[in-house]
A protein has these predicted regions:
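Aromatic/histidine-rich interaction motifs
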Residues: 93-121
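Alpha-helical residues within the helix-turn-helix
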Residues: 155-158, 169, 173, 207-208
């Protein structure tokens, strides 16, 4: 679809909420973090994202959802790729990773007039897309590391006839982060979502999220978000 692009150079994947952005073609954007949740509507072209939901290829008419504190690496295709980033509610809901829109142009038009209405329409009209089966070893490992109880990386590798070093190198090449760091990041986000979305005890959440104790969870969540679990509880009360 044809969209008007602001006349300014874009040297990287800088966030440009509300108005369409032209992504730099054939570019590999290193893993980076976003504190605020947002949705990316692909208006033209395509790109691949490797992040919190695994490795996902998206094209025109599709949407990627990113929760708070998301982290990912992007590979932009050689095609002219245009996206629209829209803010999402800052809460603990678990967004679908990928979705489709029947009429992305309508969301663009709404965003020009009323960004709040555009976000409301997006949330009302998107259709979740089921996750594709992970065929490559790094993507299989990503799915395993996102699980609530993830095995040791070395043990996982041996079962598949690989060394831990081989698996770690392959994973980091695609995801821009080591498997151990990726697992810790996903675990902290999972704990944070439970903290803000439920009234369960913090000690109970720590156990459910796979931490040895509440102190370990507190350090991980504080490192990820900049606030302790207790402060998040006070803020969402």
């Amino acid at each position: 679809m044809a969209v008007a692009i602001p006349d300014r150079a874009r040297q990287g994947r800088a966030m440009n909420l509300i108005e369409p952005s032209l992504l730099p073609a054939s570019t590999d954007i290193a893993r980076h973090h976003h504190r605020e949740p947002y949705a990316t509507v692909v208006l033209a072209g395509s790109y691949e994202e490797a992040g919190d939901a695994g490795r996902i290829a998206v094209c025109e008419g599709e949407v990627l959802f990113h929760g708070p504190f998301s982290a990912h690496r992007d590979r932009i295709s050689p095609k002219r790729t245009v996206v629209l980033d829209l803010p999402l509610p800052f809460d603990g809901r678990d967004w679908p990773a990928r979705a489709q829109l029947a009429d992305p142009g309508r969301i663009v038009r709404l965003a020009e007039r009323d960004p709040v209405e555009a976000v409301a329409a997006l949330l009302d009209e998107f259709a979740p897309v089921p996750a594709a089966e992970a065929n490559d070893l790094p993507d299989q490992l990503s799915a395993t590391l996102r699980a609530s109880v993830a095995p040791r990386i070395g043990e996982w590798a041996v079962v598949r006839g690989r060394s831990r070093e081989h698996v770690s190198r392959s994973f980091e090449k695609l995801y821009g982060v080591s498997p151990a760091a990726y697992r810790a990041d996903c675990q902290a986000k999972r704990a944070w979502r439970m903290i803000v979305a439920s009234d369960a005890s913090l000690a109970g959440i720590a156990i459910e999220a796979g931490y040895a104790d509440q102190a370990h969870m507190t350090r991980a969540v504080t490192r990820l978000t900049g606030m302790s679990p207790r402060r998040w509880r006070i803020g969402t009360a």
